[in-house]
Amino acid sequence: MDQPILYSQTSFPNFTYSPGVVQDGGNYQYLGNYNAPSYPQPFFHVPVIKSEFGAHEEETPGSCHAASFDWNLYPHFQISNQAASNSSGDPSPEGRTEEDGSVSEGRSSSSPSPNSPLVPSFAQYWHYPSWQQGNLTNQAHTLFDGGDEKPQQSRHSPTASLGSGASNTEDEEVPSAISSRAERGLCSPSPNNASCGPGTEEDGMTLEEMEEFAKELKQKRVALGYTQGDIGHALGILYGKMFSQTTICRFESLQLTFKNMCKLKPLLEQWLGEAENNDNLQEMIHKAQIEEQNRKRKMRTCFDTVLKGQLEGHFMCNQKPGARELTEIAKELSLEKDVVRVWFCNRRQKEKSKFRMSKGHEFVGGASPGSIQSEHISFTPIPANSQDYGLASLHPNRAPFYPPPFPRNELFPHMAPGISMGVLTG
């Protein structure tokens, strides 16, 4: 008996993808062994980056240009109609064509071979900045040319003016700093280079004249019986500007700079004239030296018994008086205010020292060293068979400290002698 037809089954056409739908090329069901629709494999072309100077240059041994490849992730999964669908619309790699002996660049209309295993890579190269690349390019051309160009001769070279030919420029060039220094004729500020040459001049004074004056100054100073320190004091007395003995010594030995020697020379010339004409100059210098020593050293103040007792009375009333009180005490005792102030400072420091000494002699227990020597020190003996670890106190006024014995037999009865384990376990 025939079964009734419940549904009308119409035949459907085979399901096919449109050419615009992109499928996954890595899926196994779209390989060539399966009857699946084909689709065009896309190419992602990454062109070579042009240089900053426009056209591509010929590769040199030092260039870092990377090779340009097309972006093909699946070179071994190729579809039959790939080449046909990719013939138009995709950019092609740049190529070089030679026409009439010149190198030119153009674009090729042919796509790369689909069967070639291409590796994805970026057309990227490392390069210097534009301002530095031009310098390096010029240097490279100079090196590759073989160095036929000879270095130019220095214009400062004396041999160049004579026309004797090429010579080493390093030996002939004179640094600009040294030449300008020689033209100015200034001395070095270092003390070891006091003489710069016989032609050094400043304010109409040459170095030879300065050397002669320094030698004359030393001879006259020794003949008149003056020391280098006396000259410094004499300049302070006569002209109000005192110099040290070291400065006069350096002037005589030409260890000062030429500029400083020119400033000091007029004062020394005036001193020479004053020393030759004034016989009392030596006495004036001697008095000035004595007064200077007296100003540096102050006389020590001595207090008699009555004055000291009065100061002690004021100290017992107020150990730290103020400025007004110090002035009143100084007027009362006919002393200077600074003397009274210093005495109070010293007296307070003395009081602090006494307090520290008294605290240092006392022990922690409050006994003084005299009481310890007078008392009889006795120590309590420690029993030999005792289980405690007590020690007698070393201080005589304190009782000895005995800690309780360790309860060994109570906590650990099995450790007591004469008791077996059977008795404990019972």
UniProtKB/Swiss-Prot annotation:
Pfam families per record: Homeodomain, Pou
Stretches the record annotates as Disordered: 82-118, 140-203
Keywords assigned: Developmental protein, Differentiation, DNA-binding, Homeobox, Nucleus, RNA-binding, Transcription, Transcription regulation
Single GO molecular function: RNA polymerase II cis-regulatory region sequence-specific DNA binding
Source superkingdom: Eukaryota
GO cellular component, as recorded: nucleus; transcription regulator complex
Compositionally biased intervals (Low complexity): 103-118
This protein's record includes keyword Transcription regulation: yes
UniProt GO BP: anterior/posterior axis specification; cell differentiation; gastrulation with mouth forming second; head development; negative regulation of activin receptor signaling pathway; negative regulation of DNA-templated transcription; neural tube formation; post-anal tail morphogenesis
Subcellular location: Nucleus
Composition bias, Polar residues: 154-168
UniProt note on tissues of expression: Expressed in the animal half of oocytes and remains localized to the animal cap and marginal zone of blastula embryos. Expressed in the adult ovary and at a very low level in the adult kidney. Absent from primordial germ cells (PGCs).
Domain POU-specific: 202-276
Annotation: DNA-binding region: 296-355
InterPro entries: HD (IPR001356), Homeobox_CS (IPR017970), Homeodomain-like_sf (IPR009057), Lambda_DNA-bd_dom_sf (IPR010982), POU (IPR013847), POU_dom (IPR000327), POU_domain_TF (IPR050255)
Function: Transcription factor that binds to the octamer motif (5'-ATTTGCAT-3'). Antagonizes the activity of nodal/activin signaling during gastrulation to suppress mesendoderm formation. Acts maternally to inhibit vegt and beta-catenin-activated gene transcription, probably by forming a transcriptional repression complex on the promoters of target genes. Binds to an octamer motif in interspersed RNA.
Family membership noted in the UniProt record: Belongs to the POU transcription factor family. Class-5 subfamily.
Subunit structure: Interacts with the transcription factors tcf7l1/tcf3 and vegt.
Protein name: POU domain, class 5, transcription factor 1.3
